């Protein structure tokens, strides 16, 4: 019987691959038989090499290329290297991005104190750090009229959240771009090209740990507020995203495009 969810033998390219989420995701796809390409900043090389060693020890296949998702010339070199190694790209995970603490109005500030330059930088990283890799890596998908692009949006794109103003604006733009690109690619290049996004809820990561936990590991008031509004009553775990990602990457979702899939333990759906 054919396995609709299979990604075996597929070439999966992931930007932002060396963070907590990225590490979990690339290991999952490698376990499923995909050939995984880790793209991240040069400073993450040691982490990447550790991940690759883990993957290869389990019989998987993976490689690392340092990148800068805001530098098209670097991305073009990545594309050349990937094509030389594997000859194709089947699945693109645009996960590079993140919040910037200065890109919001702090509790002791007003909107008139907003650091506009920080908001611009946050938007550039999250939005254009999604657009530019797509412009480069989707070329082979267009040529073969087949491929799945999965962008990383966020819960903060769905409703305005305090302390992440710039990040929320940027991720809302990623969601909008996802829907736009769905039509742009399918109409001009065929229905084998799909573009979707995942909008994760609250997970503890290196980026938000200081905001959500105290130095002793206990939860901050912000965390308690979040969990009170989450029907699951807990933070998500990184491995709770991989099933949705595999569905979007595989033929099981071949008629799904332009969709932002929310994985948040019910946060967005819950009301008092």
Predicted regions and their residues:
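Active-site Tyr-X3-Lys motif and surrounding loop/helix of classical short-chain dehydrogenase/reductase
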Residues: 77-84, 103-124
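Canonical Rossmann dinucleotide-binding motif of NAD(H)/NADP(H)-dependent dehydrogenases/reductases
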Residues: 3-37
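Short, small/polar-rich loop/turn modules that mediate ligand/substrate recognition or access, typified
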Residues: 189, 194, 256-258
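Conserved glycine-rich Rossmann-like NAD(P)H-binding loop of the short-chain dehydrogenase/reductase
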Residues: 34-49
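Active-site helix of classical SDR
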Residues: 134, 170, 178
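Catalytic Tyr-X3-Lys loop
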Residues: 98, 112-131, 146, 150, ...
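Short C-terminal tail/terminal secondary-structure segment
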Residues: 2-3, 159, 232, 245-246, ...
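Residue(s) in the substrate-gating loop at a strand-loop-helix junction
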Residues: 154
